[in-house]
Each structure stands twice: as C-alpha cells, then as structure tokens.
Amino acid sequence: MKVFVVLAAIVAIANGLTSGSGVTTRYWDCCKPSCSWGGKASVTKPVRTCKANGNTTIDSNTQSGCNGGSSYVCNDQQPFTQGNVGYGFAAASISGQPESQTCCACYEMTFTNTAISGQKMIVQVTNTGSDLNGNHFDLMIPGGGVGIFNGCQSQWGAPSNGWGQRYGGISSQSECNQLPTSLRAGCNWRFGWFKNADNPSMKFTQVRCPTILTQKSQCVRTPGP
C-alpha cells in the first residue's frame, strides 16, 4: 500500500498535477458559485447555475442571489456516494494556485483522521472564498452552514443565519428535515457515508474529472489533466 501511494504521488508530480495535504470544512450558502461566472478559467463553459427552484438552468451572466440577483447554486451540486467513494463539489484555496487554475479542477481526497480516516472522496472545485486559507477545501453539504453569505434566506426562506449555526450548520440528522426536500439527500449524506466527521484533515491529488461530476456542473477544464 505504501509503495502504491508513493508511485501515485510520483505520477501526479510527473504529470504536473497538484497534490498535498490540507483541511476541510463544510458549507452550503446557496449562492451562485464563483466559477459560474465567465472568464474565470479555460473551461468549456462556466459552472451551471440555477433559478431559485434549484433546477432550472439560468444564464451565467445573471447576478447572484447573494448580491440582489436571481442566480443560485443548483440542487444537484450536493454530495453523494457511488460504491465506496464519495463525490461532490467544493470551494477551495490551494497554495500557489490562483482561481484560474482551480476552477472546475477535480481532486481526490483521502481523509486522514476522524471516523472517515482512509475513506476517499472526489470533488470538483466550483467556488473560492475569501475566508479560506491555503490547501483548504470547503465541502458543499446542505445544512453545513451558510458562512459569510446567506443566499438560502432569499432562495428557500431559511433563517437569517441559515439552518443551524451560521458556521457548521445543523448538529443532528433530524434537523435535515428543516431543509427543502430537494436538499435533504445531501444533508443526510453527512450523517451517513461522511459519519458526521467534523472538519477532517486529508491528503489530496488532482485527478481527471469524472463525468459523474461534470455532467452536473457542465464545466470541464481545457485542456484537462
């Protein structure tokens, strides 16, 4: 196993892919993701963004619901599991990597502590954040806390601080019932596969984005890794 990990790291470096170790947090602010704006990176198209129903695609030039507009994150950008692997989306700040290099890039994370140590998750970066530090992935999990911005209030009528605490969100699975039905699967995922892990550390390596994610975001880097 150690040999495999070392070889994987060597291959990643040889291919010019980013790898390292870092931390995770969680959020779901309902805002239009930063990578949904055009011109952020060399991609096929910006990350799909939606009307207030969370399902209907809206033009990428539409202002964010967190800034007086009508564009919000799409419901299908919540996390899920296929086989033994978790999949989802994240805001990220990676040391030495500007947004032009991280938008719509994908990373495989291997968690290194808490109850999910050893579990793997692949995320596509769709957002950035002024409150994130180097090698920090903020996982998009409904009910995970709105953080700085609360677009969930205008989109779904959420409380002024979002569901639960502003940072960290709800604290029990039963509170997932406070969320709209369309967001509960991702909320429950946190208490299932993710085992309610609280900000686990991880190691990450950039990987080619799986179609299971790009079909949802509609964003692919050009050229991709």
Curated annotation (Swiss-Prot):
Its EC number is 3.2.1.4. It catalyses: Endohydrolysis of (1->4)-beta-D-glucosidic linkages in cellulose, lichenin and cereal beta-D-glucans. CDD domains: DPBB_GH45_endoglucanase. It comes from the Eukaryota. Activity is not affected by metal ions except Mn(2+), which reduces the activity by 40-50%. However, no significant change in activity in response to 1 mM EDTA. Glycans are attached at residue 55. The keyword Methyltransferase does not apply. GO terms for molecular function: cellulase activity. Optimum pH is 3.5. More than 90% of the maximal activity is maintained between pH range 3-5. More than 60% of the maximal activity is maintained between pH range 2-8. About 80% of the maximal activity is maintained even at pH 2.5. One of its GO terms (biological process) is cellulose catabolic process. Keywords: Carbohydrate metabolism, Cellulose degradation, Disulfide bond, Glycoprotein, Glycosidase, Hydrolase, Polysaccharide degradation, Secreted, Signal. The active site is at 29 (nucleophile), 138 (proton donor). PROSITE patterns: GLYCOSYL_HYDROL_F45. N- and O-glycosylated. Contains hybrid- and complex-type N-glycans. PANTHER family: ENDOGLUCANASE 1. Belongs to the glycosyl hydrolase 45 (cellulase K) family. Hydrolyzes carboxymethylcellulose (CMC). Also hydrolyzes lichenan and barley beta-1,4-D-glucan. CMC is hydrolyzed majorily to cellobiose (G2), cellotriose (G3) and cellotetraose (G4). Cellohexaose (G6) is hydrolyzed to G4 and G2 with traces of G3. Cellopentaose (G5) is completely hydrolyzed to G2 and G3, and G4 is partially hydrolyzed to G2. Does not hydrolyze G2 or G3. Does not hydrolyze crystalline cellulose, soluble starch, xylan, mannan or laminarin. This is Endoglucanase. It comes from Cryptopygus antarcticus (Antarctic springtail). The lineage of its organism: Eukaryota, Metazoa, Ecdysozoa, Arthropoda, Hexapoda.
